[in-house]
Amino acid sequence: MNTAPSRPSPTRRDPYGFGDSRDSRRDRSPIRGSPRREPRDGRNGRDARDSRDIRDPRDLRDHRHSRDLRDHRDSRSVRDVRDVRDLRDFRDLRDSRDFRDQRDPMYDRYRDMRDSRDPMYRREGSYDRYLRMDDYCRRKDDSYFDRYRDSFDGRGPPGPESQSRAKERLKREERRREELYRQYFEEIQRRFDAERPVDCSVIVVNKQTKDYAESVGRKVRDLGMVVDLIFLNTEVSLSQALEDVSRGGSPFAIVITQQHQIHRSCTVNIMFGTPQEHRNMPQADAMVLVARNYERYKNECREKEREEIARQAAKMADEAILQERERGGPEEGVRGGHPPAIQSLINLLADNRYLTAEETDKIINYLRERKERLMRSSTDSLPGPISRQPLGATSGASLKTQPSSQPLQSGQVLPSATPTPSAPPTSQQELQAKILSLFNSGTVTANSSSASPSVAAGNTPNQNFSTAANSQPQQRSQASGNQPPSILGQGGSAQNMGPRPGAPSQGLFGQPSSRLAPASNMTSQRPVSSTGINFDNPSVQKALDTLIQSGPALSHLVSQTTAQMGQPQAPMGSYQRHY
């Protein structure tokens, strides 16, 4: 039986649809991942999704919305405020506006992007204004807030009102400086013109050539120069006259003799720069030479002179502005402003805050200088102030030694020489009379104290000293009289070495030397004498100045006093006074 060849049955259909075949070329594609086997019904038993959700199963790990188009590898939250296009790592917590490279060696990762030192950072003006107001209200209620700290460290910018006031003050000072500069420039210019030497000196050797010399002088004056005629005497030579003219500062000198008059010529001497002498020049050529060199002289020397005048005027104007700023201008009232550093210390002192010793010394020194400046300005404004400069070292030393030696001359015990209240102000005549009577009483007490028994008891070892003290210069007595009490208190050593000038010995007034040691310091205390005259009083010092400057009578009294003190019986406390 012939049977037909059987055909093989068709192969089982591939369960993958179109495009899902196992193509090795497409399997290795980086774009398409490895194929996944899915059931025919499109649903996996372990997949609880709806069959209509066509998303990739890998997206199930990210609980995002289906419209979230970000990369599946970006695990940032939906609520992240950063831009979707920001490709930096999500662990980077920097500000999104910070585009600085972390690989930069100068990059500071701990520095805030909003730091005010960064030029990229600009704070808004309205926010800054409200912040400053809140900060001010907060700090005003703070009991520990230092309101003087931020005022001078420059951290807070000044307000618009203070800036406008500062600009107005600067403009006012600039106008005042210009005005003062013009005034000082004109004043110095007039002084320079008055002190400027003549431009040309015409030296006339013989008086017979006076008319010719005057004609030459007129031609020189027509060139714009100041001319002076000099007629030589028989005692003065021509070379000496030329030397005097050059020393006086004249740039030109023209010599006229009889030969010059005959030949209508002259000798021109140029003194400035390199000295030149042009002998027997014709008059016309001499005028051309003088005019040319005078222009050069004006260009060189007058320009330097103008610069010097401008420099002095500017310096004087600046000094005047500084003085007005310290004193305070007429629109600022009588009191001027203090320096910022001193003003802060004064404010702290006014608020009863703590100040160190150095800060207190700064305030004291500043106030002392300000007081001296005010007193100096007030004394300069007086019509006829009495100058205390003629009082040299000798008169000042005599004033120092006089009160300290007066209780010793009066023969009183030291405890009775306590300072009394200052006498009421009297007239200058009464003060002068008191001072003169004080000198007279000094001579009387010098004679009477030598006969007192208390001094006679200890006068034996001191007679040689009195003569030696009178022969010593006054500088020695001053230096020894101002010795410290630790040296003067050594009674035994002083007595063995021999008494020194100004150091009272052990037998004086019957008291030991250790008790008299503080008496040597009375030169600096300037006590009131027994006559009631306070030598610290300015009127008393003024009367003393008048007596010292005016008088033979005072010098006569002083000579009498020193003659009485030069005797061997004079006590040790009497000093020589040299005026």
From Swiss-Prot:
The modification N-acetylmethionine is found at residue 1. It is found in: Nucleus. This is Nuclear receptor coactivator 5. Widely expressed. A motif (LXXLL motif) lies at residues 345-349. Contains one Leu-Xaa-Xaa-Leu-Leu (LxxLL) motif that is essential for the association with nuclear receptors. The modification Phosphothreonine is found at residues 3, 274, 379. Residues 11-62, 68-78, 164-173 have a biased composition (Basic and acidic residues). Residues 446-457 have a biased composition (Low complexity). PANTHER family: NUCLEAR RECEPTOR COACTIVATOR 5 (PTHR23295:SF3), NUCLEAR RECEPTOR COACTIVATOR 5-RELATED (PTHR23295). Residues 395-413, 459-485, 520-537 have a biased composition (Polar residues). Residues 1-158 are annotated as: Transcription repression. Residues 458-579 are annotated as: Transcription activation. Keywords: Acetylation, Activator, Nucleus, Phosphoprotein, Repressor, Transcription, Transcription regulation. Residues 1-78, 148-173, 375-428, 444-537, 560-579 are annotated as: Disordered.
